[in-house]
Amino acid sequence: MRPWLRHLVLQALRNSRAFCGSHGKPAPLPVPQKIVATWEAISLGRQLVPEYFNFAHDVLDVWSRLEEAGHRPPNPAFWWVNGTGAEIKWSFEELGKQSRKAANVLGGACGLQPGDRMMLVLPRLPEWWLVSVACMRTGTVMIPGVTQLTEKDLKYRLQASRAKSIITSDSLAPRVDAISAECPSLQTKLLVSDSSRPGWLNFRELLREASTEHNCMRTKSRDPLAIYFTSGTTGAPKMVEHSQSSYGLGFVASGRRWVALTESDIFWNTTDTGWVKAAWTLFSAWPNGSCIFVHELPRVDAKVILNTLSKFPITTLCCVPTIFRLLVQEDLTRYQFQSLRHCLTGGEALNPDVREKWKHQTGVELYEGYGQSETVVICANPKGMKIKSGSMGKASPPYDVQIVDDEGNVLPPGEEGNVAVRIRPTRPFCFFNCYLDNPEKTAASEQGDFYITGDRARMDKDGYFWFMGRNDDVINSSSYRIGPVEVESALAEHPAVLESAVVSSPDPIRGEVVKAFIVLTPAYSSHDPEALTRELQEHVKRVTAPYKYPRKVAFVSELPKTVSGKIQRSKLRSQEWGK
């Protein structure tokens, strides 16, 4: 254990008798809070980041010791349900035991070495959290991905990241097999299944036989932890690399302040495992000793979510605004949420009327936050702070967030500009390391003393930020970031498409959706528009991830262009949004 942490834990275990009641049972102690306060001080930038840090060793194993000493309520650390009666509960001790076994699978049968990269493409199964922790224990860099990735998406990610291993489920294994021969770095394929598949190692079988003894890798704080692919407006998705500390410690403050978590809380975030919000949940909840609740939730179903909130003692809920829009359309008076005390949302703009309807029908406020794959939480409405409906909240420590013009000059309150985070003279440790293998994109994201988020907003005189839109053309539909070039490239593969432009279009449920303006080739100009629309939509679903398909299609004779011939998506977007 690191020297800076050993002192705190030994103090906790040494002093446990002093806090025992007359029956010798541990009473509520301040000691775990002292440990959390140390992590929080680092997260807030008030204490230096240690040279060495490993989340599994320095956080999870510490909570396991505190749990064993009786310094934590009897909540599980992890609680998974599938909606048909199956449940899995792990204490921190059991999580440690199972993750050490998983670490032996990665380092043994998979042959992974510290620094090697592994893709995790799994639905909401317990193995995702188990393997994530195992990656930390072995120094393996994890690369999460959504289960909707197509063969083309998987090939690009495996080739670009040079991942040596992938773990996935039965439904995606055929897609991986179809492209694995074109991915020379890929050495092992790990299957989470109760059945076998030729050419694949069965994770569950290997886990059953693995040893519980494992020495955690001694990682440096700046060593890579995770890579996330994020969509952009030009070309292929970028690789965002985060370090052991940027995620491992960077989310502690938001977990304590915005999510308001304690060791008594049970936290359910409905996010997909492939998105950064899954990592945010892990790194927010477990440092605070909280329980992560997971429902397998094969598809979003408002009634399933509401019934789950009624059945289980969930105290804290986080959903994207799209889901809250669906929930408030139900008759919420039919449900009783006896344990629910705190609700959060982020990933896209929240309509004020949704927040008001939710609060009116449940009595629970909705607290909005804002961040990116490149950062941790940038702005938020912490619990207890006055909420201004429609605002993203105030800057979250340790960030100095400003609104700047296109030259990087700070703008006064009330003026719209670029959302920027100060990175000089000191770069916040919770920032991403870089866009991997892309120094040009990394440099382009900075301007003077600031990192430019690519989003536009204004800040009022009280320091609240109000989202105005994106500088780029990325479409944010139900919190899925979709690059227009990816959709346009998919459309271009169909013989009916001469050229296309893809922009966002307003939608009452999803906030915004993909709309494609298409100029047809002469051979298809007389085709039935409705039938052709359906054909093109199905084509995009086959070529790229299904969530990227254009829900709206307009056939036009020409597209607006600049003098140099570049398509002006901004004009089409303004037309859609009435600006």
UniProtKB/Swiss-Prot annotation:
Enzyme Commission no: 6.2.1.2
Family matches, as CDD domains: MACS_euk
Keyword Nucleotide-binding: yes
Cellular component aspect of the GO annotation: mitochondrial matrix; mitochondrion
Compartments, record wording: Mitochondrion matrix
Domain of life: Eukaryota
Post-translational modification N6-succinyllysine, affected residues: K97, K303
Reaction(s) catalysed (UniProt annotation): a medium-chain fatty acid + ATP + CoA = a medium-chain fatty acyl-CoA + AMP + diphosphate
Enzyme class: ligase
The keyword Glycosyltransferase belongs to this UniProt entry's keyword annotation: no
Tissue specificity: Detected in kidney and liver.
Cofactors: Mg(2+); Mn(2+)
Transit peptide: 1-26
Primary location class: mitochondrion
Keyword terms: Acetylation, ATP-binding, Fatty acid metabolism, GTP-binding, Ligase, Lipid metabolism, Magnesium, Metal-binding, Mitochondrion, Nucleotide-binding, Transit peptide
SUPFAM superfamilies cross-referenced by the UniProt entry: Acetyl-CoA synthetase-like
Residues found modified as N6-acetyllysine: K97, K152, K303
One GO MF term attached to the UniProt entry: fatty-acyl-CoA synthase activity
Family according to the record: Belongs to the ATP-dependent AMP-binding enzyme family.
Function of the protein: Catalyzes the activation of fatty acids by CoA to produce an acyl-CoA, the first step in fatty acid metabolism.
Protein name: Acyl-coenzyme A synthetase ACSM5, mitochondrial
The species this protein was found in: Homo sapiens (Human)
